[in-house]
Swiss-Prot record:
GO terms for biological process: membrane protein proteolysis. The active site is at 387, 439. GO terms for molecular function: aspartic endopeptidase activity, intramembrane cleaving. Residues 36-207, 273-275, 343-347, 399-430, 487-489 are lumenal. It is a multi-pass membrane protein. The gene is SPPL3. Intramembrane-cleaving aspartic protease (I-CLiP) that cleaves type II membrane signal peptides in the hydrophobic plane of the membrane. This is Signal peptide peptidase-like 3. The keyword Glycoprotein applies. Residues 1-35 form the signal peptide.
Length: 523
């Protein structure tokens, strides 16, 4: 059966005021590797290897104790050289932490290092020289503190002799190193345990994350038809009745250029000015847009099931006539958002983050529309090129992947919240699998367009485009996770999702002789 065509009369559109700006900022700032997770290795296939200097880069769990009090675990990376760390650790493997003198560890230490873990700072000499000095001083391991909030891969050069280092060599970020050093203030005893847990062969979080992403796209695409309904285009808003007259944001071809420039500037800002306050700014923006999303989704669901709730209104100063539903839902949504913001580092905070994120994306896909595949092609191809450049090409310019560095964040301040995430229950790291909002929203705009196009042209699931694009999105996302598994690193999902969605509708349109109509449509 064909989808009912929308009414020929122009429906009143839902206004969102400030939410448009907030959603746009999140859309531009939500660029993280599409499928990301905490892998046990950092292999990239590029860093040089030489005989005796060919260890895999492994992710290291660095746990430390201050006067017997266990602190949070930190993350490090092993060197190409040195002894390989065990996959498990026990209290018997703990070693006392000692800062060598000099603190860079480039010369024989005046502080005794025997059977300890030397905690040295980066600089003044090579990684290999530091390792040789620490080993000659009797250290059981070397823990290097980087001079920036990132992890540097420690390699050998062609001019280096075969290192033959017999102790583990690990690096931690500057912020992680500061935590260890601060624990040693005042003469406190600090013990360190380092080991490299292996990644489990099965990641049970990925199927659930896949379902959330695919379900979000499907739900948001059909929301206005299934939940809101043609008879009720005026869902409750944060403002009064006049707010409902605002038009839906219809993207144009020039949006692609605006996206490339603005998103790149935002990404570079976060890369060069990576700080606690900038992370908190993004958290605040996420909370505001999440509040809008929660209110919108809850309000439309209530109004859909309760006809009388739609009509109950009260007059408020400035806001005008506001529905009773809004007066009830908005405070509850605000409490939910505030509780999440306060407890965002708790083990179950991901539930609230995912709920706010899904509601926000449903709202975005009701507010922002693609009118045809001409605009879709410009936007998605630009986003595709954006992902490729900032993940794979930027290391040749900035010495590291800008997007991955921003997505990884730092050990200080909150993590970037613009992702759907799911805990990896079977992983020793207790990390998360993630997918960025942009990798749901950009293809979602095209999928939502296909649903509106099918309705406008009286097509059903068998001869329309919506079902095919949903299958294409699901297939592309599956390929993303296959790439994650094979390459052992975060994947730019749009690399797979743009061909599987845009390529699908272009191919089908050409085969059916409807490509010109799709290209110039206005739905």
């Amino acid at each position: 059966m064909a989808f009912p065509a929308p009414s020929s009369s122009s429906p009143r559109r839902r206004g969102r005021g400030l939410a448009y700006l907030l959603v746009s900022v999140l859309l531009l700032a939500s660029r993280v590797p599409g499928a990301a997770g905490a892998d046990s290795e950092f292999e990239d296939g590029v860093s040089p290897k030489f005989p005796g200097c060919d260890n895999p880069f492994q992710k290291v769990k660095v746990t430390y104790w201050v006067d017997g009090d266990e602190r949070s675990s930190l993350t490090g990376i092993t060197a190409r050289f040195g002894e390989v760390l065990p996959a498990t650790g026990s209290d018997g493997d703990k070693r006392k932490a000692v800062v060598p003198a000099p603190k860079t560890g480039c010369a024989k230490s005046s502080a005794p290092l025997a059977s300890s873990i030397a905690v040295a700072e980066r600089g003044e000499c090579t990684f290999l020289e530091k390792a040789k000095t620490a080993e000659s001083g009797g250290a059981a391991a070397l823990l290097l503190i980087n001079d920036e909030d990132d992890l540097q891969k420690m390699v050998c050069t062609q001019n280096d002799t075969v290192p033959n280092i017999g102790i583990p060599v690990v690096m931690v970020s500057q912020s992680a190193g500061r935590k260890i050093l601060s624990g040693m203030d005042g003469g406190a005893k600090v013990d360190i345990l380092m080991y490299a847990p292996e990644k489990p062969s099965f990641d049970g979080a990925i199927p659930f994350l896949w379902l959330m992403a695919v379900g979000s796209v499907a739900c948001a695409s059909v929301w206005s038809f299934v939940v809101v309904g043609d008879e009720d285009k005026n869902a409750p808003t944060l403002g009064g009745e006049e707010a409902a007259d605002s038009e839906i944001v219809e993207l144009q071809t020039k949006t692609a250029l605006v996206f490339i420039v603005t998103a790149s500037l935002v990404l570079l800002f976060l890369f060069f000015f990576k700080s606690t306050w900038s992370a908190w700014l993004l958290v605040v923006l996420f909370c505001l847009s999440g509040l809008q999303g929660l209110h919108y989704v809850a309000s439309t669901l209530i109004v859909r099931t309760c006809d009388r709730c739609r009509e109950a209104k009260v007059a408020l100063p400035v806001l005008g006539n506001v529905t009773v539903v809004t007066l009830v839902i908005l405070p509850l949504a605000l409490i939910f958002v505030v509780v999440w913001a306060v407890h965002q580092n708790s083990p179950f905070a991901w539930v609230g983050q995912d709920l706010m994120g899904i509601c926000m994306m449903i709202l975005v896909l009701q507010v922002v529309h693609l009118p045809n595949i001409k605009v879709a092609t410009a936007l998605l191809v630009s986003a595709f090129m954006y992902d490729i450049f900032w993940v794979f090409i930027s290391p040749f310019i900035f010495k590291k992947s800008v997007m991955i560095t921003v997505a990884r964040g730092s050990d200080e301040g909150p993590s970037l919240p613009m992702v759907l995430k799911m805990p990896k229950e079977f992983d020793t790291w207790n990390g998360y699998d993630m997918i960025g909002f942009g990798d749901i929203l950009f293809p979602g705009l095209l999928v939502a367009f296909s649903f509106r196009y099918d309705r406008a042209n009286g097509k059903d699931l068998t001869d329309g485009y919506f079902l095919c694009l949903m299958i294409g999105y699901a297939f592309g996302l599956s390929c993303t996770y296959v790439g994650l598994y094979l390459m052992k690193s975060g994947q730019p999902a749009l690399l797979y999702l743009v061909p599987s969605t845009l390529g699908t509708i272009v191919t089908l349109g050409a085969k059916r002789g409807e490509l010109s109509q799709l290209w110039n449509a206005k739905v």
